[in-house]
């Protein structure tokens, strides 16, 4: 409601809440910081886990920042913006989601301190933008170039990523699986590696131990052979990929046939049978002995395929068909009549095997396959889910290094270097923007501070010590949380991709976006019956938008 010439003017519907200026900024900063604090305790090798229980009672126990934020039910728009930070980090770099969110939350906390000193948001925004740009330049300067073909470096990168996750006890095996998988699907274009992670499939089966997980240089499909008389194992497989049904096609128009005698019925059925037999005959003539079909296979077609000794699998997912094409060199055909011997792929073995009481098809021994499968085993569903999350992060960071050929020391070392260098840069800029740049630099110390805090170390003592040694001994000095002391991360093989840290610093954009908001208009949201939200923060909730998690 507003007033003009003493007359009240109703603009917004009843129940709408509006927050303007400092109130809007504080409320948004509070919501974003709550998200950052939620995941902060999971950061680093000594980070804690979160137990997430959904409305159906299903439980997820993890310390993966992206998974936690994806599973939390959020209502506050500023909180959702922080989730977008994590999603972008995961998509662009594959790791460092918690780091990105924690940095964004700390930048907002430091911005609030400046707001309390009556520094205008525009000045803070400009200072943060200058600092973020400078930080990116510094990261490029301090990055260590590595050989993308150096397996030892790739293994160290993968192990650093897995360290601290629930699958850590098998990090050597999992790192090896991740590196081998990425190297197998990597392709060189214009002298640089390009890795399409869609060509790495994760297939999970509960049972056995994690140590039984393996890399299949081909494709594993959760299907079974369609007919009991078909072979269960084919060596020297010539593989046909068909994305149409091996069935008699129905006409597009509703036609009716009047059958007046048994002979006509027999003739009709014989024609159907001939059409199906012709399809199978054509497949056999091409030399194919294994057929994967994206759609259905008629019972009669199954019978004829079995007579020819051809293994057939039906209703294969489109994504699996594409991986089979990449692995075996086969071409996917849309019409059986168009199938030629040149369209067939090759694998040394195609076999149906029983795993955890279920049949699965293994396509192995492909010639230089550009699609592979990591078969994940583990005692329970929770275990294999955590192993899958660890492997997903590991393959992404290995991809980063193979494509960029650049790494940084981990253990908070790059953030300490940035904090020192950006603080020096603030002195060159001067003016009120320098205050924002100094606060930006100070905010970056939240990463080494949190690593120490989560390891149960004295944060003040270790932070002073590590910054001092970093200045004296070089940019490799970070915090070894296992030894509880400053150490050279490069010497200890604790490294991370340049891309992860660069993308995490870009989280400053989210902080800038939130600081730009000075007016929030929130419509009243009707809450479903029987659903209770968490209590509002001291500053209140936004127009029916609770802080549910």
From Swiss-Prot:
Keywords: ATP-binding, Chaperone, Nucleotide-binding. Residues 529-549 are annotated as: Disordered. GO terms for molecular function: ATP binding; ATP hydrolysis activity; ATP-dependent protein folding chaperone; unfolded protein binding. It comes from the Archaea. SUPFAM superfamilies: GroEL apical domain-like (SSF52029), GroEL equatorial domain-like (SSF48592), GroEL-intermediate domain like (SSF54849). InterPro entries: Chaperone_TCP-1, Chaperonin_TCP-1_CS, Cpn60/GroEL/TCP-1, GroEL-like_apical_dom_sf, GROEL-like_equatorial_sf, TCP-1-like_intermed_sf, TCP-1_chaperonin, thermosome_alpha. Gene3D superfamilies: GroEL (3.50.7.10), GroEL-like equatorial domain (1.10.560.10), TCP-1-like chaperonin intermediate domain (3.30.260.10). Pfam families: Cpn60_TCP1. Belongs to the TCP-1 chaperonin family. Forms a Heterooligomeric complex of two stacked eight-membered rings. Molecular chaperone; binds unfolded polypeptides in vitro, and has a weak ATPase activity. This is Thermosome subunit alpha. It comes from Thermococcus sp. (strain KS-8).
């Amino acid at each position: 409601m507003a007033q003009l010439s003493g007359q009240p003017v109703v603009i917004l519907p009843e129940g709408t809440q509006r927050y303007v200026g400092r109130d809007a900024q504080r409320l948004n900063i509070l919501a974003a910081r709550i998200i950052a604090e939620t995941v902060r305790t999971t950061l680093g090798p000594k980070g804690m886990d979160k137990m997430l229980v959904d409305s159906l009672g299903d439980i997820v126990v993890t310390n993966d920042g992206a998974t936690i934020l994806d599973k939390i039910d959020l209502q506050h728009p500023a909180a959702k913006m922080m989730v977008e930070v994590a999603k972008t980090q995961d998509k662009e770099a594959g790791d460092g989601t918690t780091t990105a969110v924690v940095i964004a939350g700390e930048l907002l906390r430091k911005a609030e301190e400046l707001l309390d000193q009556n520094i205008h948001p525009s000045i803070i925004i400009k200072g943060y933008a200058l600092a973020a740009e400078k930080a990116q330049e510094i990261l490029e300067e301090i990055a260590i170039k590595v050989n993308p073909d150096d397996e030892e470096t790739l293994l160290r990168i993968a192990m650093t990523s897995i360290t601290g996750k629930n699958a850590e006890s098998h990090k050597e095996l999992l790192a090896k699986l991740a590196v081998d998988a990425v190297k197998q699907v990597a392709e060189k274009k214009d002298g640089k590696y390009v890795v399409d992670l869609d060509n790495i499939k994760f297939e999970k089966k509960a049972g056995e131990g994690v140590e039984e997980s393996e890399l299949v240089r081909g494709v594993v499909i959760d299907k079974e052979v369609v007919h009991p008389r078909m072979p269960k194992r084919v060596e020297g497989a010539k593989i046909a990929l068909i994305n149409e049904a091996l069935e008699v096609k129905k006409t597009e128009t509703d036609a009716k046939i009047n059958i007046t005698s048994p002979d006509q019925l027999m003739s009709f059925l014989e024609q159907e049978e001939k059409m199906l037999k012709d399809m199978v005959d054509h497949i056999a003539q091409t030399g194919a002995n294994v057929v994967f079909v994206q759609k259905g296979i008629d019972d009669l077609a199954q019978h004829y395929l079995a007579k020819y000794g051809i293994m057939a699998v039906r209703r294969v997912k489109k994504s699996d068909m594409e991986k089979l094409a990449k692995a075996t060199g086969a071409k996917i055909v849309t019409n059986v009549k168009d199938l030629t011997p040149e369209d067939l792929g090759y694998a040394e073995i195609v076999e149906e095997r029983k795993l955890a009481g279920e049949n699965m098809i293994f396509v192995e021994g492909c010639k230089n396959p550009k699609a592979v499968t990591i078969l994940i085993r583990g005692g329970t569903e929770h275990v294999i889910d955590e192993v899958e999350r660890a492997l997903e992060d590991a393959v992404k960071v290995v991809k980063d290094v193979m494509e960029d050929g650049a790494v940084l020391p981990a253990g908070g070392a790059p953030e300490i270097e940035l904090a020192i260098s950006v603080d020096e840069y603030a002195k060159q800029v001067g003016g009120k923007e320098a205050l924002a740049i100094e606060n930006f630099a100070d905010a970056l110390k939240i990463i080494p501070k949190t690593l120490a805090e989560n390891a149960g170390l004295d944060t003040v003592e270790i932070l002073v010590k590590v910054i001092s040694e970093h200045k004296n001994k070089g940019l490799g000095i970070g915090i070894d949380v296992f030894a509880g002391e400053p150490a050279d991360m490069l010497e200890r093989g604790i490294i991370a991709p340049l891309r992860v840290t660069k993308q995490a610093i870009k989280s400053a954009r989210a902080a800038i976006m939130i600081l730009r908001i000075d007016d929030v208009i929130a419509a009243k949201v009707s809450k479903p019956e029987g659903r209770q939200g968490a209590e509002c923060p001291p500053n209140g909730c936004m127009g029916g938008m609770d802080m549910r998690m």
